Amino acid sequence: MREAFLVDENSGEKYSLSEPRWCSDTKSPLNFSEVKGITPDLIKSAEKSIWRYKSAFPCKIPEPVSLGEGCTPLVPFSFRERRALFKLEWFSPTGSFKDRGASVMMSFLKQQNIKEVVEDSSGNGGAAIAAYGAAAGISVNIVTPSNASAPKISQIKAYGAKVHLVPGSREETEQAALEMAKSVFYASHNWHPFFLQGTKTLGYELWEDLNFKAPDNIIIPTGAGSNVLGCY
């Protein structure tokens, strides 16, 4: 099998996975040259985390950084007089689905020997990257709006991350993080292509939970859309 690489789908520019980067030279998002799928026989059923689907990741990561993310309950319930199945992602280690993306992204950054990262987040993304950064031995800076939830800021700090409060809008927070990213690697859950490799495992889990059949429909609450993009 050919080695995967990163590609800017706007320009066609290609980048090796050996080069730490989160965007193209023209600041466009990056995707993988090949998006691998998986068959039931490739699932590592003894692994009780998203790493049971590691055969679907674009490259080998021999030493994953895992806190037991994934394998969350799928619970039947009545919703507007219809039968629905609820995926309880709040059972994740830090309380959200973003642990899936953080696990794969931080595992890959550790493999690339990244020592310090910065991320802009108003809550769950920052908590996930702070936790998995601590598990990976990577120093984490979280840039967050000054009006962010106090309990969420406390959670981020509890994992040992440095919190940088920015007055103003969410966009101003992102700009502050990008300024810091001139000297520290930008581990953005909205930009780094390996983050979606983690969130896509939600789709594999639903498929496996339903005896390897896709659900009729998936309803996903969304902000930036990483859960939707992962399942897609």
PLM regions: where:
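PLP-dependent amino-acid enzyme catalytic core
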Residues: 1-232
